[in-house]
Amino acid sequence: MNAIWIAVAAVSLLGLAFGAILGYASRRFAVEDDPVVEKIDEILPQSQCGQCGYPGCRPYAEAISCNGEKINRCAPGGEAVMLKIAELLNVEPQPLDGEAQEITPARMVAVIDENNCIGCTKCIQACPVDAIVGATRAMHTVMSDLCTGCNLCVDPCPTHCISLQPVAETPDSWKWDLNTIPVRIIPVEHHA
């Protein structure tokens, strides 16, 4: 019984010693992150889709901050993200990537042909924003509100039952330009 207590004490002391060494090393050799990169990374949508040409949002944020990369390459974030980054960096807003985009491309969303889906879950594993729901050997479906149209779920599908389709433009999904709607202000008199 005495040997067990000695072993427990020895392991505890070793754990305490290594913990203290790791704690000291983490403070002594800490790497300070660039606060601008952190702020840009917080603005980006974290979809990790790779449409900007970088493997994720963090490398794109580093490229913007350190290498002077264009701020208009985030397709899922669109114009709203580009404007926030421009405001943060005090630079001029740029047209969305595509040099001189005249027409904004239609928003694409993944659609699964559920009759051909075998429930392999490869699309679920590939989706960076968890927009696909389903279970093993069960039908899968896409939550269109979450889908960024990044196309990463199409190639892994063994039955090729996933396709990207444009989102139908409805009054709910249409981008309203409220500044072009004529509004007449009618003065109201208050009577006491």
Curated annotation (Swiss-Prot):
Keywords annotated in UniProt: 4Fe-4S, Cell inner membrane, Cell membrane, Electron transport, Iron, Iron-sulfur, Membrane, Metal-binding, Repeat, Translocase, Transport
GO MF term list: 4 iron, 4 sulfur cluster binding; electron transfer activity; metal ion binding
Cofactor binding, note field: Binds 3 [4Fe-4S] clusters.
Binding-site residues for [4Fe-4S] cluster 3, renumbered to this chain: 127, 147, 150, 153
Residue positions binding [4Fe-4S] cluster 1: 49, 52, 57, 74
Domain 4Fe-4S: 32-91
Pfam families reported for this sequence: Fer4_21, FeS
Major site of localization recorded for this protein: membrane
InterPro entries: 4Fe-4S_dom, 4Fe4S_Fe-S-bd, 4Fe4S_Fe_S_CS, 4Fe4S_Ferredoxin_RnfB, Elect_transpt_cplx_RnfB/RsxB, RnfB/RsxB_Proteobac
Domain of life of the native organism: Bacteria
4Fe-4S ferredoxin-type domain: residues covered: 108-137, 138-167
Keyword Protease in annotation: no
Assigned GO CC terms: oxidoreductase complex; plasma membrane protein complex
Enzyme Commission (EC) number: 7.-.-.-
Locations listed in the record: Cell inner membrane
GO biological process: electron transport chain
Cofactor: [4Fe-4S] cluster
Positions that bind [4Fe-4S] cluster 2: 117, 120, 123, 157
Ranges for region Hydrophobic: 1-26
Function text: Part of a membrane-bound complex that couples electron transfer with translocation of ions across the membrane. Required to maintain the reduced state of SoxR. Probably transfers electron from NAD(P)H to SoxR.
Quaternary structure and interacting proteins, as annotated: The complex is composed of six subunits: RsxA, RsxB, RsxC, RsxD, RsxE and RsxG.
Family: Belongs to the 4Fe4S bacterial-type ferredoxin family. RnfB subfamily.
Protein name per Swiss-Prot or TrEMBL: Ion-translocating oxidoreductase complex subunit B
Annotated source species: Escherichia coli (strain K12)
